[in-house]
Protein backbone atom coordinates (compact mmCIF):
# COMPACT_ATOMS: atom_id res chain seq x y z
CA UNK A 1 0.00 0.00 0.00
CA UNK A 2 1.44 3.35 -1.02
CA UNK A 3 1.36 6.29 1.37
CA UNK A 4 1.50 9.00 -1.32
CA UNK A 5 -1.68 10.99 -1.80
CA UNK A 6 -2.35 11.05 -5.53
CA UNK A 7 -4.62 14.12 -5.44
CA UNK A 8 -1.86 16.43 -4.17
CA UNK A 9 0.72 18.18 -6.30
CA UNK A 10 4.36 18.82 -5.36
CA UNK A 11 3.40 21.97 -3.43
CA UNK A 12 0.44 20.32 -1.69
CA UNK A 13 -2.15 21.81 -4.03
CA UNK A 14 -5.23 19.73 -4.88
CA UNK A 15 -5.44 18.38 -8.42
CA UNK A 16 -7.38 15.81 -10.37
CA UNK A 17 -5.41 12.64 -11.08
CA UNK A 18 -4.66 12.02 -14.76
CA UNK A 19 -6.01 8.56 -15.55
CA UNK A 20 -5.49 8.87 -19.31
CA UNK A 21 -2.73 6.26 -19.52
CA UNK A 22 -4.43 3.70 -17.29
CA UNK A 23 -5.92 0.51 -18.68
CA UNK A 24 -9.68 0.10 -18.73
CA UNK A 25 -10.73 -2.72 -16.43
CA UNK A 26 -13.96 -3.81 -14.84
CA UNK A 27 -14.11 -2.35 -11.36
CA UNK A 28 -16.66 -3.07 -8.65
CA UNK A 29 -17.15 -1.57 -5.21
CA UNK A 30 -19.53 -2.47 -2.40
CA UNK A 31 -20.27 -0.09 0.47
CA UNK A 32 -22.58 -0.33 3.44
CA UNK A 33 -24.20 1.79 6.09
CA UNK A 34 -26.69 1.39 8.91
CA UNK A 35 -29.60 3.39 10.27
CA UNK A 36 -30.44 2.51 13.87
CA UNK A 37 -33.92 3.41 15.09
CA UNK A 38 -36.61 2.60 17.60
CA UNK A 39 -38.30 -0.79 17.00
CA UNK A 40 -41.61 1.01 16.39
CA UNK A 41 -40.01 3.14 13.68
CA UNK A 42 -38.68 0.04 11.93
CA UNK A 43 -42.15 -1.54 12.07
CA UNK A 44 -43.70 1.61 10.58
CA UNK A 45 -41.19 1.66 7.72
CA UNK A 46 -41.51 -2.05 6.96
CA UNK A 47 -45.31 -1.83 7.00
CA UNK A 48 -45.18 1.03 4.49
CA UNK A 49 -46.98 3.38 6.87
CA UNK A 50 -44.56 6.32 6.94
CA UNK A 51 -46.31 9.64 6.33
CA UNK A 52 -43.86 10.58 3.57
CA UNK A 53 -44.51 7.35 1.65
CA UNK A 54 -42.38 4.39 0.60
CA UNK A 55 -39.21 4.88 2.63
CA UNK A 56 -37.32 1.88 1.25
CA UNK A 57 -38.17 2.49 -2.40
CA UNK A 58 -37.40 6.19 -2.16
CA UNK A 59 -34.08 5.56 -0.37
CA UNK A 60 -33.10 3.00 -3.02
CA UNK A 61 -33.77 5.45 -5.86
CA UNK A 62 -32.03 8.29 -3.99
CA UNK A 63 -28.92 6.14 -3.56
CA UNK A 64 -28.86 5.23 -7.25
CA UNK A 65 -29.31 8.86 -8.28
CA UNK A 66 -26.57 9.97 -5.88
CA UNK A 67 -24.08 7.46 -7.27
CA UNK A 68 -24.64 8.92 -10.74
CA UNK A 69 -23.87 12.42 -9.40
CA UNK A 70 -20.83 11.59 -7.27
CA UNK A 71 -18.46 13.58 -9.48
CA UNK A 72 -20.65 16.66 -8.88
CA UNK A 73 -20.60 16.19 -5.10
CA UNK A 74 -17.03 15.11 -4.34
CA UNK A 75 -14.26 17.41 -5.58
CA UNK A 76 -11.71 15.79 -7.91
CA UNK A 77 -13.82 12.67 -8.63
CA UNK A 78 -13.91 11.67 -12.27
CA UNK A 79 -17.29 11.41 -14.00
CA UNK A 80 -17.90 7.73 -14.71
CA UNK A 81 -20.15 5.81 -17.07
CA UNK A 82 -21.53 3.42 -14.48
CA UNK A 83 -22.59 0.06 -15.86
CA UNK A 84 -24.36 -1.02 -12.67
CA UNK A 85 -25.56 0.54 -9.46
CA UNK A 86 -27.77 -1.22 -6.97
CA UNK A 87 -28.93 -0.34 -3.49
CA UNK A 88 -30.30 -3.05 -1.23
CA UNK A 89 -31.96 -2.27 2.09
CA UNK A 90 -32.59 -5.00 4.62
CA UNK A 91 -34.12 -4.88 8.09
CA UNK A 92 -31.81 -5.72 10.97
CA UNK A 93 -34.06 -6.41 13.95
CA UNK A 94 -31.05 -6.87 16.25
CA UNK A 95 -29.92 -3.28 15.56
CA UNK A 96 -32.88 -2.42 15.38
CA UNK A 97 -32.81 -0.64 12.05
CA UNK A 98 -31.86 -0.98 8.43
CA UNK A 99 -28.70 -2.13 6.66
CA UNK A 100 -27.98 -0.43 3.34
CA UNK A 101 -25.66 -2.11 0.82
CA UNK A 102 -24.67 -0.34 -2.39
CA UNK A 103 -22.86 -1.90 -5.34
CA UNK A 104 -21.30 0.12 -8.15
CA UNK A 105 -19.63 -1.23 -11.29
CA UNK A 106 -17.82 0.36 -14.21
CA UNK A 107 -15.51 -0.64 -17.01
CA UNK A 108 -13.09 2.24 -16.95
CA UNK A 109 -9.81 3.75 -15.87
CA UNK A 110 -10.66 4.62 -12.27
CA UNK A 111 -12.47 2.97 -9.40
CA UNK A 112 -16.05 3.26 -8.19
CA UNK A 113 -15.50 3.29 -4.43
CA UNK A 114 -16.77 6.85 -4.05
CA UNK A 115 -19.90 6.06 -6.07
CA UNK A 116 -20.74 3.09 -3.83
CA UNK A 117 -20.03 5.10 -0.67
CA UNK A 118 -22.13 8.02 -1.93
CA UNK A 119 -25.03 5.71 -2.78
CA UNK A 120 -24.98 4.10 0.68
CA UNK A 121 -24.67 7.47 2.43
CA UNK A 122 -27.50 9.16 0.56
CA UNK A 123 -29.78 6.14 0.95
CA UNK A 124 -29.19 6.31 4.72
CA UNK A 125 -29.83 10.06 4.75
CA UNK A 126 -33.06 9.53 2.82
CA UNK A 127 -34.26 6.95 5.34
CA UNK A 128 -33.57 9.46 8.11
CA UNK A 129 -35.37 12.25 6.26
CA UNK A 130 -38.45 10.19 5.55
CA UNK A 131 -38.80 8.82 9.09
CA UNK A 132 -37.57 11.72 11.21
CA UNK A 133 -41.12 12.80 12.02
CA UNK A 134 -41.50 9.70 14.21
CA UNK A 135 -37.89 9.19 15.36
CA UNK A 136 -35.39 12.06 15.42
CA UNK A 137 -32.98 9.91 17.46
CA UNK A 138 -32.13 7.66 14.51
CA UNK A 139 -28.39 7.10 14.09
CA UNK A 140 -26.56 6.74 10.79
CA UNK A 141 -23.36 4.73 11.25
CA UNK A 142 -20.90 2.32 9.76
CA UNK A 143 -20.57 3.90 6.32
CA UNK A 144 -17.62 2.03 4.84
CA UNK A 145 -16.15 0.32 1.83
CA UNK A 146 -16.76 -3.42 2.20
CA UNK A 147 -15.12 -4.66 -0.98
CA UNK A 148 -13.52 -3.50 -4.21
CA UNK A 149 -12.21 -5.37 -7.21
CA UNK A 150 -10.24 -4.36 -10.28
CA UNK A 151 -7.70 -1.69 -10.98
CA UNK A 152 -4.01 -1.22 -10.37
CA UNK A 153 -4.24 -1.20 -6.57
CA UNK A 154 -5.79 -4.67 -6.55
CA UNK A 155 -8.68 -6.12 -4.65
CA UNK A 156 -9.80 -5.23 -1.13
CA UNK A 157 -12.22 -6.90 1.25
CA UNK A 158 -12.99 -5.95 4.84
CA UNK A 159 -11.33 -8.38 7.20
CA UNK A 160 -9.22 -10.06 4.53
Swiss-Prot record:
Q: Which GO terms describe its molecular function?
A: cyclic pyranopterin monophosphate synthase activity
Keyword Ribosomal protein included in the entry's annotation:
no
Under the heading InterPro entries, the entry gives:
MoaC, MoaC_bact/euk, MoaC_sf, MoCo_biosynth_MoaA/MoaC, Mopterin_CF_biosynth-C_dom
Which is a GO BP term held by this UniProt record?
Mo-molybdopterin cofactor biosynthetic process
Keywords (alphabetical) are: Lyase, Molybdenum cofactor biosynthesis
Entry EC no(s): 4.6.1.17
Enzyme class of the recorded protein, top EC level: lyase
| Reaction(s) catalysed (UniProt annotation) | (8S)-3',8-cyclo-7,8-dihydroguanosine 5'-triphosphate = cyclic pyranopterin phosphate + diphosphate
Catalytic residues at 129
Task: Look up the record and name the pathway of this protein.
Answer: Cofactor biosynthesis; molybdopterin biosynthesis
Known function: Catalyzes the conversion of (8S)-3',8-cyclo-7,8-dihydroguanosine 5'-triphosphate to cyclic pyranopterin monophosphate (cPMP).
The family annotation for this protein states: Belongs to the MoaC family.
Protein name as catalogued: Cyclic pyranopterin monophosphate synthase
Amino acid sequence: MTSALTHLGAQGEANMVDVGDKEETTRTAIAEGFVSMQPETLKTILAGNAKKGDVLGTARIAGIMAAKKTHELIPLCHPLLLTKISVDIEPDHALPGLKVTALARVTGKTGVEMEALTAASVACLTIYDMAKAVDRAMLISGIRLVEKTGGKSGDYKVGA
